[in-house]
């Protein structure tokens, strides 16, 4: 707990990180591992629930199809496919995002363990990479938790009464992931954190532009700004519709 700061017996607070802002973000960096773990747990429960619901939809039959005596499977209905396969596609995307994040986090951890990265006094590139990692971990956790709660509820409903039976685990998974919306950070606050960090990164990018680069930036963006504020885009869209 006193890796970056300490409190003496007389109550004096000292820290090896002089900047309050950097000290704050350095302490926040310790939450990255937990948020990755919570997000990964939520994503894993979601994939397990989808596997159960999709398999059930391929087996469960109801109502006769075109041929007499043959009943349609649940998965044959378009509305049933949409309610399961769209979340399944998003789960694949989150899994790939998770793997990329874990690789990046491992690289940063290896650099710290090797002594090439001092969390208390990082280089400018390391400081920005650390903040980016914090933002990515935050949005991954928030997105995975929200997706888990919505998808597991959908899986439960897609399986009908069978989905409510504890032996089929869907209600267990649903109860398991509910806490993840606030565990390791409230999802709403985490999204606000990501928005703040994006604005900060945007400010860095603009402040480092050369005069020529700034002029080019203004010219390339002024058209879009004027279009949005004048309502031209809405008028053109109305004519197109």
What kind of feature is each model-predicted range?
Residues 1-241:
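Flavin-dependent oxidoreductase catalytic core characteristic
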């Amino acid at each position: 707990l006193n890796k970056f700061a300490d409190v003496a017996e007389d109550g004096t607070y000292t820290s090896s990180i002089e900047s309050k802002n950097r000290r704050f973000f350095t302490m926040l960096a310790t939450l990255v591992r937990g948020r990755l773990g919570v997000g990964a747990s939520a994503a894993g429960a979601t994939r397990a629930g989808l596997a159960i619901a999709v398999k059930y939809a391929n087996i469960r039959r109801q109502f006769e199809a075109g041929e007499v005596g043959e009943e349609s499977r649940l998965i044959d209905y378009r509305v049933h496919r949409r309610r399961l396969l769209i979340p399944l596609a998003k789960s694949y995307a989150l899994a790939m995002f998770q793997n990329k994040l874990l690789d990046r986090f491992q690289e940063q951890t290896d650099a710290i363990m090797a002594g090439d990265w001092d969390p208390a006094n990082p280089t400018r590139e390391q400081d920005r990479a650390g903040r980016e990692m914090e933002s990515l971990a935050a949005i991954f956790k928030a997105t995975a938790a929200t997706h888990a709660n919505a998808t597991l509820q959908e899986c439960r409903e897609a399986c009908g009464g069978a989905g409510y039976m504890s032996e089929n685990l869907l209600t267990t998974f649903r109860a398991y992931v509910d806490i993840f919306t606030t565990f390791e950070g409230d999802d709403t606050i985490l999204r606000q954190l990501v928005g703040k960090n994006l604005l900060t990164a945007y400010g860095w990018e603009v402040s480092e532009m050369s005069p020529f680069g700034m002029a080019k930036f203004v010219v390339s963006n002024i058209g879009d700004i004027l279009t949005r504020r004048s309502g031209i885009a809405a008028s053109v869209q109305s004519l197109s519709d």
